[in-house]
Amino acid sequence: TCALPILYQPKTMPAIVMVPAMRFVAVDGVGDPNEEGGDYAKAMQLLYGISFTVKMSKKSKNPAEHIGGYFDYTVPPLEGLWSMGEGVSGVDYAHKADFHWTSMIRLPEFVTDKIFAWAKASFAAKHPESDVNRAYLFDFDEGVVAQVMHEGPYDDEPATVAILDDYAR
């Protein structure tokens, strides 16, 4: 995150930035992210579990689990893509049960398909109740975007998004 402060420490005023292509662990779902024990909570367990499996691989006593090209890093913050479903513009905060989401955490460049498969299998062995097949590698190239830091409750996000939309037009 320190390597990309313009992305991970945005200002509270809208700005146009260039986002490079990045690799993520991602999980898709539908529903209210605030539902206790719901689908979103399960997705968070997968995302953070797999992310920290990669990060902590350096501490493994098993040489087969040591990752070539590994460098120590801070697990980046959670990111997400939100919609109300295909063909619907915007997000209706009054109908969170209808949210369609992709939640994701950026992974370091050294995470290959093989390393990702190992991380999923390793996490699944410790958490057999988790459906690791929901997690996938996602290469995302956003390019030029408008961004702003929202401060405050999630339910106040629509006002921040409206400011961002006006700026982007």
PLM region descriptions:
Residues 2-4:
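Short, small-residue-biased leader/transition segments that mark boundaries at the very start
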Residues 10-18, 28-100, 104-105:
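Active-site loop/lid in soluble adenylation, ligation, and acyl-transfer enzymes
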Residues 30-36, 107-111, 144, 151-156:
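A generic structural motif
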Residues 7:
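Basic, Lys/Arg-rich alpha-helical nucleic-acid-recognition elements, primarily the DNA-binding modules
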Residues 114-163:
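A mid-sequence, solvent-exposed acidic-amphipathic segment
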Residues 24, 98-102, 132, 145:
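Broad gene-expression machinery/nucleic-acid interaction feature
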Residues 38-54, 123-124, 156-169:
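Long, well-ordered alpha-helical scaffolding segments within enzyme catalytic domains
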